[in-house]
Structures are given as C-alpha cells and as structure tokens.
Design a protein with these regions (language model features):
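Secretory targeting and sorting signals
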Residues: 1-33
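Hydrophobic alpha-helical segments, especially transmembrane helices
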Residues: 10-11, 72, 259
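A generic short-segment signal for beta-strand/edge and adjacent turn/coil regions
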Residues: 11-13, 44, 57-62, 89-93, ...
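Active-site-adjacent loops and short helices of periplasmic peptidoglycan-processing enzymes
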Residues: 24-27, 31-189
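Penicillin-recognizing serine hydrolase domain
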Residues: 35-43, 51, 139-304
C-alpha cells in the first residue's frame, strides 16, 4: 500500500499451501549461547515476557518505520477501551473499500453493507492485515462527527496509549501503517513493550496465534482469512504476532513463542530475512537449534 511516498506492501504472488515441517530440536552449546544471535535486521529486540527481562537487542532505541506492525496498537486501543463490547456489530462502509483501493492496501476484502462484530474485525485486522478492518475499527472507536475526525481521534488514542506504556520513542500518524508524512515510527524496544502488553490480553492472544479463520457476517457471507505471519505453524511454539512491510520500513516482524511456562517476545525492523532472524533469536533465547520450513499461503491470500 502506498501513500505520501511511504508504502506498506501488498503482495500478489500466488503460493501453494503446504504443511510446515519441524526438525529435531537440539540444544545449543554454552559458547554459542554466549555470542548472541547474528541477525540482518537493522533493529531488533528480544525479551522474556513474564519477568519482563531484556535478553538481547540491536539498535534498540533507534527510531524506524514500522509499517503494518502499527496494527498491534490498533488492536490494543480497541481491546483496552473501557466497556468494550466485542460482539458489537459494525457495518462496512464503501469508504473503507475505497480507502484500500486508493492506497493499494492489504485488505480483509470487507463488503459494503456487511455487519461484523468487533471481535471478527480484529481477526480481519491481524490475520490478512486488513486496512479496511483497521479503518472500520478506528471509525468506530474514535470520536467526532465525521470519519476524518473519528480516525484522527483514534490515532490520538494510539499515541496516548504509547505514552502510558512508556513508549517514549514511538509516534503514530496512522491507524494501519500507511503514513502520510513518515511520522509513524517506533523502536525495537518500544515495539517489544507493546507486544508484551498485547499478549497479556487473552482475546488478542487468541486472534494472533490463529493461522486462519472463517468468520460469518450477519447476512451469511463467510470470510476466510489467512495469517500473513508465516512463523506460525513453522516454528515450534510460535504464538504470533504481526507482520509489516513498507518501502521505507522494509520487512518487519513482531513475534512471540511459548515453550512450557516461558514466553519470549521479539521484534525485527527492516530485516532482509525476518523469519530467519526471528528463528535465530528464538533459538538463542531457548538455547536450542532448529531448522524451519516456512508455512506457505494459499493462492490469493494476502501477504504482508
């Protein structure tokens, strides 16, 4: 998707679906563990979620564009709205579809007039990276008399939430990652803080760990969405979280994996090989070696 010279990419390549294969997990030597992971990402961060302990980082506080990983905050603002009703129905407007078409954006392909619940739209937001779903949620949870006012209000809520969470080097100018002026940025450390917060919400966790979902609108239309995060179903214990790709941001990934009672969350920003980077970081955190065959997506599925 492109706007104001900053793009968040929508891929159209058709891929054949397959089942991911796991290799035997082997322990890592103490010497290898001491060196830390070697990753190609320009920025990265790794934390142990429960004790909130930093495990490793690279350029942790350097500000970078975040593309569609922005949508993690979109979801958090919705889910942490006081008295939020996840079953509330939202009617899809033509303006949501027009926005996607105008920006060449990733989409949940929402149809005008369909009514879906807030919970369903969270799946449409986080799995296919639907900018139309993001628009619908921002339009609903913002305040004001016009769409422009409501979405602006929602973005203000995103920035207030970032401030509340101590994300001092993060700014949002977008509800979905399409930045008009390049003022939509974060740092690996800030993004990891947000990931940890988000994973504390059970609804968020259920959404982002799903590799696919079928959701039925009130008129009976069935939406099938596939998760753009290929780490799911490919890396043992992976439980999320969100992809993002942009012309300035590059490929980004906010990710997490759980083994036993331990949850590790990580971030890579502007990575030439985000899944390999994530695998290396998680292997290092869990002190294991794995090989990984990436889950592929069906023909026509959104890729971000």
């Amino acid at each position: 998707m492109r706007s104001g010279g900053i793009s968040v990419r929508r891929w159209g390549t058709a891929l054949v679906a397959s089942t991911a294969a796991f290799a035997v997990i082997t322990p890592m030597s103490s010497a290898q563990a001491a060196t830390g992971p070697s990753v190609g990402a320009k920025g990265a961060f790794l934390l142990d979620s429960k004790p909130n302990k930093t495990l490793w980082s690279k350029a942790a506080d350097t500000k970078r564009q975040m593309a569609s990983t922005t949508k993690v905050m979109t979801a958090v603002v919705v889910l942490e709205t006081r008295g939020v009703d996840l079953n509330k129905k939202i009617t899809v407007k033509q303006s949501y579809r027009d926005y996607v078409a105008r920006n060449g954006a990733s989409t949940a392909d929402l149809k005008k007039g369909d009514k879906l619940s807030v919970r369903q739209l969270l799946y449409g937001l986080m799995l296919p990276s639907g900018c139309d779903a993001a628009f619908a949620l921002a339009d609903t949870f913002g305040t004001g008399t016009t769409e422009a006012a409501r979405t602006k209000s929602f973005i203000s809520k995103m920035n207030r939430k970032a401030s509340d969470l101590g994300m001092a080097n993060t700014k949002y100018d977008s509800f979905d990652g399409i930045s008009q002026a390049g003022n939509n940025y974060t740092t690996p450390r800030d993004s990891a803080k947000l990931a940890r917060r988000a994973l504390g919400n059970s609804t968020f966790g259920s959404v982002v760990k799903a590799t696919s979902t079928k959701q039925t609108a009130t008129n009976g239309r069935v939406y099938t969405w596939y998760n753009t995060n290929k780490l799911l179903g490919s890396y043992s214990g992976a439980i999320g979280i969100k992809t993002g790709t942009g012309s300035v941001a590059g490929p980004c990934l906010v990710f997490a994996a759980k083994r036993g009672d331990r949850t590790v969350a990580g971030v890579v920003l502007n990575s030439p090989d985000r899944y390999t980077d994530a695998k290396k970081m998680l292997d290092w955190a869990f002190r294991t070696h794995t090989t990984m065959k990436l889950r592929t997506l069906p023909a026509g599925a959104e890729q971000d």
